[in-house]
Structures are given as structure tokens and as C-alpha cells.
Regions:
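Short amphipathic alpha-helical coupling segments at ligand-binding clamshell hinges
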Residues: 75, 79, 132, 170-181, ...
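Extracytoplasmic small-molecule ligand-binding "clamshell" domains
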Residues: 1-41, 45, 110-111, 197, ...
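Short helices/loops that flank or line small-molecule/ion binding pockets
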Residues: 20-32, 74, 114-135, 142
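Periplasmic-binding protein-like
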Residues: 55-59, 145-179, 201-207
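Hydrophobic/proline-rich hinge and linker segments of small-molecule sensing/allosteric domains
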Residues: 49-72, 163-166
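A ligand-binding cleft/hinge motif common to bilobed small-molecule-binding domains
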Residues: 24, 37-45, 97, 127-150, ...
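Ligand-binding cleft/hinge of the Venus flytrap
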Residues: 1-9, 51, 77, 88-111, ...
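Flexible hinge/capping segments at coil-to-helix
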Residues: 63-83, 172-173
Length: 208
């Protein structure tokens, strides 16, 4: 965000907030910008999608002793425990359809923050979780016990995630200025350096 606001000549104030609350604050105009937001028609009603941040790959990670049971998403129902998911996160259309099934919902354990979801894995409250692939790889580096216990079994969704601006809180003129500013820095050495730091990619084919 600082790369964007510096280019746009704006001042950035970072506000910490759980993901579901951040979406609500963006919709009401109480915060102006968010990072790493997947596109949905519902979100487009209250958020202007300024430009792609990076390509995200959502994966299902499962306890290795149960990994052989999972061949498709609905096989979660074969597990003797829960799968952790981030509340209000978007993991692709297939997941949206499946999670609407009451029989499937009982296997999902919701977290309000990434930290809560990480703790579910560390404390073995869940048998797996849906994660951003780069996030899971980073957690494996930081916490070797996770790498020993969990493995990626399915890729659920590959799609760009965006920087967005509140339609309620940010004027149309400023939203356009921000969009133009992001276009100037997108793919620049500074942008690529940020992506490399977190293991992210601009190219969808890189995540295949």
C-alpha cells in the first residue's frame, strides 16, 4: 500500500483489523483501502478494484495421516475432525457452492484472523485448513512442526487478488487517481521486490 500511496502523493495510516471486520469497514467507508481482496460481484458493489496485487493460489492442507482420504473437496466429510477456514474469505466458486451445503458446514471451523487459523493448526484443533499457498510455505519455514504434520493435497482456486478502495469513503476522482498511480508502479522493480520478499507472483502460470 505504501508503494501505491507514495506514487499517488497520499498519506497512509495503517489500521489493524480482523479480515471480516475490515470488509465491513471498507463497505461503510470507515477505511479507505485494503490489500489482497479477491474479486466477487458482491464486493464490487462497495469496493473499486484498483489493480492486481499478485496471483493467489488457495490450497487445502491436511494432516498427513489423513491425506490419502482426500481426492476432491467434498472428501473433507470423510475426516474425523474440522478444517479451518478464514471467515468471509473467498476460496473459489466450487468452495462457495460446497460450503452452502449444511452437511458440509459441520466440518468447517471458522477463524476471524490468520493468527487464529495458524493457532488452530499448531494446537491441532483442526485436521487441516484452506490457505494461501505462499502463506502455508512461510508458516512451514517458521514452524517446522507444521511441515512435519501437514501437506498440500488439493489446489482449490487460482486467481488474482487486488488492491481495492472504498466506494463509500473515497471519491470517484481519487479512486481513478489511485488506479492510475497503481498502473504506474505495477510490475516495477519496487513492486517485484515486495512480491519476491513474500514469495508472490504476478504470473498465474507460475502457480500452476
Amino acid at each position: 500500500l505504501r508503494l501505491l500511496t507514495n506514487e499517488a502523493g497520499c498519506t497512509l495510516e495503517v489500521v489493524g483489523s480482523p479480515w471480516p471486520r475490515s470488509l465491513n469497514l471498507l463497505e461503510s467507508g470507515d477505511i479507505d483501502l485494503m490489500l489482497t481482496v479477491s474479486y466477487t460481484e458482491e464486493r464490487n458493489q462497495f469496493a473499486e478494484f484498483l489493480g492486481v496485487h499478485y496471483m493467489e493460489e488457495s490450497v487445502l492442507v491436511i494432516d498427513k495421516q489423513y491425506a490419502s482420504r482426500i481426492r476432491k473437496l467434498t472428501d473433507i466429510g470423510l475426516l474425523p475432525g474440522f478444517v479451518g477456514v478464514l471467515r468471509d474469505a473467498y476460496y473459489g466458486e466450487e468452495f462457495e457452492q460446497v460450503k452452502a451445503d449444511p452437511d458440509f458446514q459441520q466440518y468447517l471451523l471458522y477463524a476471524n484472523t490468520l493468527t487464529q487459523k495458524l493457532n488452530m493448526l499448531k494446537r491441532q484443533r483442526v485436521l487441516g485448513s484452506v490457505e494461501d499457498k505462499t502463506q502455508f510455505i512461510e508458516w512451514n519455514r517458521q514452524y517446522p512442526e507444521l511441515a512435519q504434520r501437514y501437506q498440500i493435497v488439493l489446489t482449490l482456486h487460482r486467481a488474482p487478488v487486488y488492491i481495492v478502495a472504498s466506494r463509500q469513503g473515497v471519491s470517484k476522482e481519487l479512486r481513478q487517481h489511485l488506479k492510475n498511480s497503481w498502473a504506474k508502479v505495477y510490475g516495477s522493480p519496487e513492486h517485484l521486490a515486495i512480491l519476491a520478499e513474500f514469495g508472490w507472483s504476478l504470473d498465474e502460470s507460475d502457480t500452476a
